[in-house]
């Protein structure tokens, strides 16, 4: 029986770039989840009634409870069926694929991505559309609007879902199908990549060593299935591959600061190729012995070698794209290959219109997200398999190419090297972060600064506040990041991030292109030292925030 339960609105239920993310303690408030899920049901197109949805998450604390609430409210709103992974597990890329493969109405994904998990940490809920992609602003703003005036929600009291084994079960009016969360995704990867070629490469090069670190996020079982079962590598290549509700007390963010377990193993054992993924499986880091691959370089190198991957060789490449703060390395690939390169705001949803219009095939973000039009989310394990396929393909052409360093050098010899670094200042006071942005805005908004040297050697060539005009639907996204380009080929960008659950996170991005091959092997921080100095001077960062060092350097 459908029950209508009275409720009151909560402030601040505004979904960000990747859904609603808050502390678990916020989600635990009475009716907090119920309100947001009801608001989500109200925007399901064409209607929640009769809808088929996928529901699952990265296994973080509060995941199971949230699934129970979603099932009850889904039943109350006439949803016909939900598909859930065993134990409630489902990586974000796998969820996107399942929506598309089974032509579902949409999906509710439970994750706070790379943010820490546990009773005192973060949780998140996001809605994906029938194309498998994250809900765009037009939809998330509708959800937010409903949460501000909500007065009731509809539910059916159903017994706790049994998510321990696969199978189809009825709970009142709701059908619940529990599936293997890994199976469909593994099948998709086998259709995209040349697994025979990778296996051949591994057998011919016994000195090639590999390690995959899931950081106790959701991709552990996916990594074990692909790298061990399918590609035949020993189980020892997978570490931290058991999903844990608090990610083992760590921060499931694949970067040099938080993926210390991977970095330590690669450095200790001189591993040729190491890779890590994040909490929900949509990010990846590629890190080998003496060879960290920046995300900006990674997507550019994948774009350059796309024809080595069967999916692109057979289906063609429509175009490339990057988020605005991502380095211009992929722009050079696009120019060389005669492909359009789109510059979009941060947030994967901005790529999805381009995918659906067949304008785009490969894209990436500097925040360790790479992906393609095979699904409508970024995809960490896909990115790792790209590198294995590219290494195997290049090695088949030239047996001397067998390391990440070899691939990087080959790329730099064609395009030059775009040195790149990101400084994150986390949990700043909002006022201090605002003052730093004001310093940047003073230059970005002042057109008279063009042609002026703001510091010796740093003459402004262009500056502004990035705005995006979607070429498909005509929508506009303004205030997407402040940038200054200089005549010496360098660029700095600042953004306030919207994905943290407390405090402000200021992100500072710096890059400089180098065509002198004698400098390609420089450490990025050494090569960028003048740019970093200029950025910190322009922004008065230490003076305004009191921070001598960033929280994270990438």
Swiss-Prot record:
Q: Which GO terms describe its cellular component?
A: cytosol; nucleus
Q: What does this protein do?
A: Catalyzes the reversible isomerization of alpha-D-glucose 1-phosphate to alpha-D-glucose 6-phosphate. The mechanism proceeds via the intermediate compound alpha-D-glucose 1,6-bisphosphate. Key enzyme in hexose metabolism. The reverse reaction is an essential step for biosynthesis because glucose 1-phosphate is the starting point for the synthesis of UDP-glucose, which acts as a precursor for the synthesis of oligosaccharides and trehalose.
Signal peptide extent: none
Write one Pfam family the protein is assigned to.
PGM_PMM_II
TM segment ranges: none
Q: Where in the cell is it found?
A: Cytoplasm; Nucleus
* Free-text remark on how the cofactor is bound: Binds 1 Mg(2+) ion per subunit.
Name of protein: Phosphoglucomutase
Chief location bin? cytoplasm
- Name the coenzymes or cofactors required: Mg(2+)
The EC class name is isomerase
Source species: Schizosaccharomyces pombe (strain 972 / ATCC 24843)
Q: Which residues form the active site?
A: 113
Q: Which reaction does it catalyse?
A: alpha-D-glucose 1-phosphate = alpha-D-glucose 6-phosphate; O-phospho-L-seryl-[protein] + alpha-D-glucose 1-phosphate = alpha-D-glucose 1,6-bisphosphate + L-seryl-[protein]; alpha-D-glucose 1,6-bisphosphate + L-seryl-[protein] = O-phospho-L-seryl-[protein] + alpha-D-glucose 6-phosphate
E.C. number, please?
Answer: 5.4.2.2
Q: Where does alpha-D-glucose 1,6-bisphosphate bind?
A: 21, 113, 282-283, 346, 365, 367, 378
Under the heading InterPro entries, the entry gives: A-D-PHexomutase_a/b/a-I, A-D-PHexomutase_a/b/a-I/II/III, A-D-PHexomutase_a/b/a-II, A-D-PHexomutase_a/b/a-III, A-D-PHexomutase_C_sf, Alpha-D-phosphohexomutase_SF, PGM
């Amino acid at each position: 029986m459908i029950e209508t339960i009275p409720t009151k609105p909560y402030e601040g239920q505004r979904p960000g770039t990747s859904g609603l993310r808050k502390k678990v303690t916020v989600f635990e408030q009475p009716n907090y989840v119920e309100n947001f899920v009801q608001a989500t049901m109200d925007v399901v197109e064409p209607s929640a009634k009769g809808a088929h949805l996928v529901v699952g998450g990265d296994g973080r604390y509060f995941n199971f409870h949230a699934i129970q609430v979603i099932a009850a409210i889904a039943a109350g709103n006439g949803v016909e069926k939900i598909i859930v992974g065993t134990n409630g597990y489902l990586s974000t890329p796998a969820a996107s694929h399942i929506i598309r493969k089974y032509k579902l109405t949409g999906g509710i994904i439970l994750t706070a991505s790379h943010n820490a998990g546990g009773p005192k940490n973060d949780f998140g809920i996001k809605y994906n559309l029938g194309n498998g992609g994250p809900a765009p602003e037009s939809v998330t703003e509708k959800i937010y609007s409903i949460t501000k005036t909500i007065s009731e929600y509809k539910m059916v009291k159903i017994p706790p879902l049994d998510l321990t084994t696969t199978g189809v079960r009825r709970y009142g009016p709701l059908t619940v199908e529990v599936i293997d969360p890994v199976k469909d995704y593994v099948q998709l990867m086998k259709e995209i990549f040349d697994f025979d070629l990778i296996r051949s490469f591994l057998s011919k090069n016994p000195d090639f060593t590999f390690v995959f670190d899931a950081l106790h996020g959701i991709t552990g079982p996916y990594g074990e299935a692909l790298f061990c079962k399918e590609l035949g590598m020993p189980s020892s290549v997978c570490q931290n591959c058991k999903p844990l509700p608090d990610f083992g007390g760590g921060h499931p963010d694949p970067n040099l600061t938080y993926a210390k377990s991977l970095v330590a193993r690669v450095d200790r054992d001189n591993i040729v190729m190491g890779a890590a993924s994040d909490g929900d499986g949509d990010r990846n880091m590629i890190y080998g012995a003496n060879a960290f691959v920046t995300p900006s370089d990674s997507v550019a190198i994948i774009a350059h070698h796309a024809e080595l991957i069967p999916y692109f060789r057979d289906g063609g490449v429509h175009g490339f794209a990057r988020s605005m703060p991502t380095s211009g390395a992929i722009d050079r690939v696009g120019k060389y290959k005669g492909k359009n390169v789109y510059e979009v705001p941060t947030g994967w949803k901005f790529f999805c219109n381009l995918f659906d219009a067949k304008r785009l095939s490969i894209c990436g973000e500097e925040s360790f997200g790479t992906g393609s039009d095979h699904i409508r989310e970024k995809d960490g394990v896909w990115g790792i398999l790209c590198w294995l396929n590219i290494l195997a393909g290049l090695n088949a052409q030239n047996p001397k190419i067998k390391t990440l360093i070899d691939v990087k050098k080959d790329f730099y010899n064609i395009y030059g090297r775009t040195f790149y670094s990101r400084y994150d200042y986390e949990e700043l006071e909002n006022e201090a972060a605002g003052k730093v942005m004001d310093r940047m805005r003073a230059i970005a908004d002042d057109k008279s600064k063009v042609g002026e040297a703001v510091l010796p050697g740093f003459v402004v060539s262009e500056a502004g506040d990035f705005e995006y005009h979607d070429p498909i639907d005509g929508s506009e996204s303004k205030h997407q990041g402040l940038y200054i380009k200089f005549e010496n080929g360098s660029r700095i960008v600042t953004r306030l991030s919207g994905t943290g659950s407390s405090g402000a996170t200021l992100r500072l991005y710096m890059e400089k292109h180098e065509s002198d091959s004698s400098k390609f092997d420089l450490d990025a921080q050494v090569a960028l030292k003048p740019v970093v100095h200029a950025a910190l001077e322009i922004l008065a960062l230490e003076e305004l925030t009191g921070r001598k060092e960033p929280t994270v350097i990438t």
